[in-house]
C-alpha cells in the first residue's frame, strides 16, 4: 500500500491541531510538496536494505516518503512537540510502516553513536539552514557507516559544498566535506514548496563516501587536515607560502614543506584541493614533526576504524 504524503493544507491543519508555530531559532521550514520529497528520496537511491538517518523531520513530509521506499528510518528532532507528534502522524498515513520508524528527541550537533542501537547506512534530510554545515560534518565523522548522503540546504551552501578548487564559492566546507567522499549538486528547490516560505532557494547535494578512503580516517589525522584547511582559508588570497608560515614556523620552512608535497608555494590556499591538504600534512610528517594540540595523543594515522569525531 502506498503511503499518503502530506500536502500544503494538511501541513497547516496539522500544525494548528497541535498549536504549533515554526521557530526561526530551529530553522523550521516544512516541505509540503509531494513531488519534491519524492524527488529527494529518488535522488538518494535508498532501498529496503537501508537504515536512514533523517535530521529535523518536522511534521513528517520527508519521513513518509522515506518509509514509502521500505527503508528503516531513525528521525532525530530537536523540537519535543514535533518529536512527540511524528509517530501519530505516520500511523495516521500508513499501516505497519510506523514500525520501521524510531523518533529521537535530540540535538543533532551532539548526536552520537551511543544514541542508536543500529548504525545508519544513509543520511537523508532537509537540514536546518542555521546548522547545515556543522551538522553534516559532524554526522559524516561520527557515523562512518553512512555511505550515502542526500541533503537539502540553502542554495548558497549547496554551491559552496559542491564548489571546485579555485572557484569563487570554494572554501572551508568544500574542502572538508571532500575528506569523506565525492560531492555533486542535484538541482534547486523553489521556496514555494515550503511552509513558512523562506526568502532563499534551496539546493540538493549528494555525497557518496569513498568506498576505500585514500587517506587515514582516524580523528587526529582528520583534525590536523582540517586545521590546515582553516589556516589556508583564514587569508585565502595569500600565497600558500605566507598562509602556512606561522604553522610551519617561518616562510622558508613553509615553502620547503609545500615543495616536499609537490605544491607550488606561490599558489593561493583557495586553489588547494583536499588531496593537496592531505599530501602537505603527510609530507610534513615525514619532513618534520607536525605540531599537535596539547591534548592530542601520539598520532595513530593507520587506525581507520577510529570513529570519535574531532571537528
UniProtKB/Swiss-Prot annotation:
The family database entries (PANTHER family) matched by this protein are listed as: DIMETHYLADENOSINE TRANSFERASE, DIMETHYLADENOSINE TRANSFERASE-RELATED
Principal localisation = cytoplasm
* Record-linked SMART domains: rADc
Q: Does the keyword Transmembrane apply?
A: no
Identify the Gene3D superfamilies for this entry.
Ribosomal RNA adenine dimethylase-like, domain 2, Vaccinia Virus protein VP39
Keyword set, alphabetical order? Cytoplasm, Methyltransferase, RNA-binding, rRNA processing, S-adenosyl-L-methionine, Transferase
Native source species:
Mycolicibacterium vanbaalenii (strain DSM 7251 / JCM 13017 / BCRC 16820 / KCTC 9966 / NRRL B-24157 / PYR-1) (Mycobacterium vanbaalenii)
**Family stated for the protein in its record:** Belongs to the class I-like SAM-binding methyltransferase superfamily. rRNA adenine N(6)-methyltransferase family. RsmA subfamily.
Quote the EC number. 2.1.1.182
Record's InterPro entries?
A: KsgA/Erm (IPR001737), rRNA_Ade_diMease-like_C (IPR023165), rRNA_Ade_Mease_Trfase_CS (IPR020596), rRNA_Ade_methylase_Trfase_N (IPR020598), rRNA_adenine_dimethylase (IPR011530), SAM-dependent_MTases_sf (IPR029063)
Q: Which domain of life is it from?
A: Bacteria
Q: Which GO terms describe its molecular function?
A: 16S rRNA (adenine(1518)-N(6)/adenine(1519)-N(6))-dimethyltransferase activity; RNA binding
What is the name of this protein? Ribosomal RNA small subunit methyltransferase A
NCBIfam families reported in the protein's UniProt record: ksgA
Q: Where found? A: Cytoplasm
Record's function text: Specifically dimethylates two adjacent adenosines (A1518 and A1519) in the loop of a conserved hairpin near the 3'-end of 16S rRNA in the 30S particle. May play a critical role in biogenesis of 30S subunits.
